[in-house]
Amino acid sequence: MSKILGRLVSRLNQIRRLKESRKYITVNEYFSQVKSIIFTNSRHLKEENKKFGKLNGDITFYVIRRTPPGAGLFSNYLLVLMHLKYAELNSLTPIIDYKNYSNYYSGKSNSTSENYWDNYWDQPTEYNLDEVYKSSNVILSSANISKLLEKNYGYYDLNSKKFLENQRQINDFNGISNSIKLRRSVKEKVNNDLKSIFASKQNILGISLRGTDYLNTNLAKGHYKPLNIDEAILLTEKKLVEWKMDYVFVCTEVKEYIELYVERFGEKALFLKRQRFSNSQSEKFITQYRFRRNNDSFETGLEYLREVYL
């Protein structure tokens, strides 16, 4: 009886959490996930084998997708890297599809949706989605491949401590990451940022600080707790001396952190000028907050991408 009750509670909790994302996904996606929770105790997409048409009979395509509405830009990116490794290990031809699955960057999926991936990065193949969805051998990916990668191939989840302690796997995935090229227009913006922010400056320490939804223990389950701002500044002071650095580049979505770094380090504090959030905006996932500007979802993703690449 207790096991049955536990399963029921688990399903009800998942449906409750799904309701929080309801306005970011389509009606069909919502009820499909509710159905999946009821029958499988998981809302996430499962791997499927499909035959959509007669094209490319000698190729097996691997469509990389994520359960709508997905997550933040680099959470999605890391998931794609793991799927690309799986495709490589199984001699599959990968393509990333964020057009037919609702997400925070291109909105609810519809007939006019863009594949937001193509706004930031090139595809890992010369084929396009239209051709793939007319082909005879297509695998639609599961939402997350990390457990299968570890169980069958010994590759660790990119978010895990075990991965960060394995230099061979770091090098392996670094190679995969380098094969994913920034879209030319984005690359040009990054190069301009490099020139305008760093110019001829040398000996620059980089620090990445998360706040906002990472400070909410209910939203950040499964994530490591970030340094608080006092800890970060103390560590920065120590490393500037220890590593003989002249500047510190601060990568963060939190405007208060930038202000405190400028207050403490003055002109030694370097940063990308962009829209940032307040730490008080921690009641929802950061991807659910919006700035009042045209095409904000794309612009916020682009600013984050440029900052991380610096």
Predicted regions: what they are:
Residues 244-310:
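Donor-binding and catalytic core of enzymes assembling or modifying cell-surface/extracellular glycoconjugates
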Residues 18, 23-236, 242-243:
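Secretory-pathway glycan-assembly enzymes, especially type II membrane glycosyltransferases
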Residues 1-22:
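Boundary detector for helix-to-coil junctions that initiate low-complexity/charged tails
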